[in-house]
């Protein structure tokens, strides 16, 4: 990752947005493959990738169990995710002939669709209430598709966009960086894994054994950053069951590996070929750089993923403004 590609934290200059800001309901803007150029030149893309890289830097070399600041906004976001988790318990899967895509997910999703703005309003202070409808759209986009009952990296990106928007309106601040990943995103992953297991959700746009993972990407990026300069855990260790079982509570990357091995059968090299290849990379910093490049190429620059991304006033489609 070239230093020049780093963006400043999106919250650095916009901790308190102007009261005159016109919030809008985000909508799709990428309708055809040629529109992808608009996305890559957009303020939204610059702010989104800047946010991902800022957090990547923030968690470098730190364990999940590291002692970090937890603000009231972080606690409220965790409570929001706890609510989504509770709704899963209240919405058990239904008996149906098809093994995958349990229709009870639609009941769960309908509740979120109805309550999303109320949930976001518990996190956003009243003087920023005008931002709630815009920000809530990203939360609704972050948990899968209720028609197809699937989940993939586009939904994960919507959750990162949701957090990025909360930074841009000043709800989350620069010193929340570690907690955004270790507390909020980690809890989000737990809830998404529970959704995937409970309702047997299909992977959206999965590349099968040639993809990195059926459902997630960001925890591999941030998780590899956590492991940079680790005194003894090297990339080759993540395919070692003992190393994973002993260290997964400290490292997001190893939690992802544990989940894959719980969900899939057979040799690791066969069901997760891409990850198996990554285990041969000599250092975590090289893994981290490679995953950032791969994320851009396989997720952010792929029309089937980005066609669903929504743009509003906080993540706008207009070209990057300098300064």
Curated annotation (Swiss-Prot):
Highest taxon of the lineage: Eukaryota
Pfam families: PTPA
Keywords: Acetylation, ATP-binding, Cytoplasm, Isomerase, Magnesium, Metal-binding, Nucleotide-binding, Nucleus, Rotamase
Residue positions where N-acetylalanine is found in the record: 2
UniProt-listed InterPro entries: Phstyr_phstse_ac, PTPA_C_lid, PTPA_sf
Binding-site positions, ATP: 148, 153-154, 304, 307-308
An example molecular function term from Gene Ontology annotations: signaling receptor binding
Annotated catalysed reactions: [protein]-peptidylproline (omega=180) = [protein]-peptidylproline (omega=0)
Region named Disordered: 1-22
EC number: 5.2.1.8
UniProt cross-references to CDD domains, sorted A to Z: PTPA
Annotated positions binding Mg(2+): 208, 214
A GO CC term assigned to this protein in UniProt: calcium channel complex
Function: PPIases accelerate the folding of proteins. It catalyzes the cis-trans isomerization of proline imidic peptide bonds in oligopeptides. Acts as a regulatory subunit for serine/threonine-protein phosphatase 2A (PP2A). Modulates PP2A activity or substrate specificity, probably by inducing a conformational change in the catalytic subunit, a proposed direct target of the PPIase. Can reactivate inactive phosphatase PP2A-phosphatase methylesterase complexes (PP2A(i)) in presence of ATP and Mg(2+).
Protein name: Serine/threonine-protein phosphatase 2A activator
Organism: Mus musculus
